[in-house]
A protein has these predicted regions:
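Active-site-adjacent betaalpha module
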Residues: 2-4, 33-37, 41, 59-194
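Short acidic, Gly/Ser-rich segments with clustered Asp/Glu that frequently serve as metal-coordination loops
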Residues: 13-17
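Glycine-rich, proline-tolerant flexible connector loops at the mouths of alpha/beta enzymes
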Residues: 22, 55-57
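A short alpha/beta connector and helix-capping loop motif
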Residues: 1, 19-48
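Short beta-strand segments at enzyme active-site cores
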Residues: 7-8, 44-51, 135
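Solvent-exposed loop/turn segments at secondary-structure junctions
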Residues: 12, 53-55, 139-141
Length: 194
């Protein structure tokens, strides 16, 4: 079965945000590097996806200089690097065409954020008929503030707020939502030791 690794938003933009200090997986680049090495060694496709917000002046604006793969990661020659402007790597991109032209039937998804772009891409891939594997320990997220929380609070206050959704809860919820419905949940070790 032909498969592709789809790496979603593992980019320097996230490291520039104050909440990265509370990331569930600050060493995500190492996990992704290990996956990429394995896929390359097996001659399998890798697609790198970057999130962009042109003209916003944020760390996701290409003008910021942070819209690039995290330090320690590099696309090899022939590996597509595509940009997206939504939470879904299929929407506003040519990802579907790349996968179809390569005869891909299974996608392996990893990236940032666990419950946003990585999960959304996973759900859409399943809806498009792909067999999907979600590499839970090669994703990362940060705490989510309650919808009624005041904006601009320091990270310590966000983390202390009992209404904040903590990273372990986010990851568990994502696993429950995806497993057996949209994807098979696997770990880096399981995929690299096959």
């Amino acid at each position: 079965m032909k498969r592709a690794l789809v790496v979603v938003d593992v980019q320097e933009s996230f490291r520039q945000r104050p909440n990265w200090a509370a990331s569930s997986n600050p060493e995500i680049a190492k996990q992704v590097h290990r996956l990429a090495d394995t896929f390359r060694a097996r001659g399998e496709m890798i697609v790198w996806v970057l999130h962009v917000e042109p003209g916003t002046g944020t760390v996701f604006d290409p003008e910021s200089g942070y819209v690039r793969l995290m330090d320690g990661l590099e696309a090899a020659e022939g590996e597509p690097v595509i940009t997206k402007t939504s939470f879904n790597a299929f929407y506003t991109t040519n990802l579907q065409q790349l996968l179809t032209s390569a005869g891909i039937v299974e996608v392996v998804v990893c990236g940032i954020r666990t419950e946003q772009c990585a999960e959304t891409t996973t759900r859409d891939a399943a809806g498009r008929g792909y067999e999907v594997t979600f590499v839970i320990d090669a994703t990362a997220t940060t705490p989510i503030e309650h919808r009624d929380a005041l904006p601009g609070r320091p990270l310590a206050e966000i983390l202390a707020d009992p209404r904040t959704l903590q990273v372990d809860d986010i990851i568990a919820r994502t696993e429950y939502a995806l497993a057996g419905r949209f994807a098979t949940i696997r770990t880096v070790a399981e995929l690299t030791d096959e």
